[in-house]
């Protein structure tokens, strides 16, 4: 049996964990930060944040040349601490939120998929997380 490679991306945000959680989980906010670069956007975001609940977002190139759906089912939700889910293809993702005073560390670990090189996946997920940091710090 092949072992799935786990990849971790992380950042520290200058905002309290309650605000970071709100920005991460509410669809109105997700649509504004969920992209790896300025030429992409997320026109659709839905989120039923509870164990067994589903989430879905649609990421598209702004020029309409490409797009894909991203979604899964929540396995664990601990407010202001942990979100874990299983993607449609069976891969697992866990996000940990560590709040301390007015900063929040966000650590995201995911099972790598087998189509693209791990480095590209890590760069893509880190770029989205960096965009989230920028959005959160600009909107607190």
Each predicted region: which residue ranges?
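Hydrophobic ligand-binding cavity/cleft-lining segments
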Residues: 1-40
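Short, surface-exposed coil-to-beta transition loops
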Residues: 6-8, 66-71, 90-94
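A short, structured loop/turn motif at beta-sheet edges
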Residues: 17-18, 49-50, 75-80, 96-105
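Hydrophobic pocket/interface hotspot
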Residues: 20, 30, 55-57, 74, ...
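Glycine-rich portal/gate segments that line the openings of hydrophobic small-molecule binding cavities
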Residues: 41-84
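Short, highly charged C-terminal tails/helix-capping segments
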Residues: 135-140
């Amino acid at each position: 049996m092949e072992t799935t490679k786990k990849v971790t991306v992380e950042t520290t945000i200058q905002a309290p964990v309650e605000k970071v959680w709100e920005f991460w989980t509410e669809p109105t906010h997700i649509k504004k930060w969920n992209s790896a670069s300025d030429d992409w956007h997320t026109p659709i975001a839905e989120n039923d944040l509870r164990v067994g609940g589903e989430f879905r977002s649609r990421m598209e190139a702004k020029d309409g040349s490409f797009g894909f759906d991203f979604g899964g089912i929540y396995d664990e939700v601990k407010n202001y601490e942990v979100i874990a889910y299983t993607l449609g293809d069976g891969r697992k993702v866990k996000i940990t939120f560590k709040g301390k005073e007015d900063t929040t560390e966000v650590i995201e670990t995911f099972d790598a998929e087998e189509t693209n090189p791990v480095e590209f996946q890590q760069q893509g997920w880190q770029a989205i997380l960096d965009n989230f940091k920028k959005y959160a710090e600009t909107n607190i």
